[in-house]
Amino acid sequence: MNILLICGSPRKQGNTAQILRQLSIALEGETVTMVSLAELHLNGCLGCSVCQSDLEKPGCVQQDDITALLQQVMEADAVVYGTPLYGHSYSGQLKLFMDRHVALFK
């Protein structure tokens, strides 16, 4: 099984990252990849809908790390999102990434 762990914390070595690392250990024997959104260059969604023009693959006019990350999401059998709670909600980093998921919805 191919499992993608996405760490939505702005702190690369914070509690969320530690929890996801423990999960990775518990999933020994599976193919596990962990991605820290804090280490990626991701811009906010422009709402231009260009990503909806190609039905075969996700695309975006922005030149950032989203294309590679969305490819990992599509190839994964399971995706686990980890985030700290700030202001009774998930982190801004995870919100930004979730907004960019629109490229997957055709």
Predicted regions located by residue number:
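N-terminal beta1-alpha1-beta2 submodule of the flavodoxin-like/Rossmannoid cofactor-binding fold
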Residues: 1-104
